[in-house]
Amino acid sequence: MPAMDARKVIALILPAVLLPLALASCSNTQTPPAELKKTATTCMQNQDYECAESNWQDYLKQRPNDSEALAALGIAQNKRDEHEQAVVQFRKAIAAGEGTYDLFYYYADSLAKTGKTDEAIDWYYKTLAIVPTLVDARGDLAKLLVQKKRYYEALALLAAFDAHLTAVGQQPYFDGQRIAIETAMQQANAADSEEKTQIRLFKMDGNFMAPVTLGDARVAAFVVDTGATVTTLSDVLLQEAKVKYEVVQPSVTATTADGRRVRARLINVDSIKVAGFELKDIPAMTCSTCQLLLGQQALSRFDLSSSKAQGVEFLTLKPRKL
């Protein structure tokens, strides 16, 4: 066999040696952050959450303090049922100052799905403080409150929203869920209720709404109005309730909250229930267009305490010991 030139041997070996080095060099080339962010955003829009998660993770390796990206990664992980990982990203995003309603909503959802119910309730309330009309958050929150045996708080939350819809000419949204909660409450042991001694109310549209039961009627949301003397009812509710009452004055002129003057009746209602607390002999006014509200003569039966934390306001009603 003829001898091979050593220079040819070296020439053959060098490409084989250099090729892996060249490939390694290519593999270490980073995709620009802007491109990763664009791809991740497109994947989110296309609901390809595996793609979104991968690209957000690569993006955050280069931009670790981007709070919006941290929140987006958490949402992608939430969508993939990776809730423990999502909670970590959401907490980082919030600690970095991110504060959007979708971040709060998905954070609450992941907290609930990892068994952190009390924290989830807090963050659902924060979500509603930003967007009160978010029905998914309201419905999910009500379910968690039922798990904690806070039935009336859940009913007030849903009834208040349905009352708002009715006032603007729309159909109630939570009728079915309210029926389910009322049924669960009737079947539960009252001694186990978290609301044996007090009821907590959430502020909606500038008002605290209390769950009130009148006779045979369903639980309704009443505005808590410390500036009004008497409780006001609608004629429709009074008729549905079939409650015992006495007419005190058959015809009076009353001024409504929006300034209208209407004809009304002053009555004395035998019994009403605010949450699970029964009140006897309650003075009230009723008319065809009266707004449902609890006046001072009913509220004076309770000790009221308000609280506000991180943008969320609550009012607690605790029956006075007479």
What are these regions (language model features)?
Residues 2-14:
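Bacterial N-terminal signal peptides that target proteins for export
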Residues 23-322:
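Pepsin/retropepsin-fold aspartyl endopeptidases
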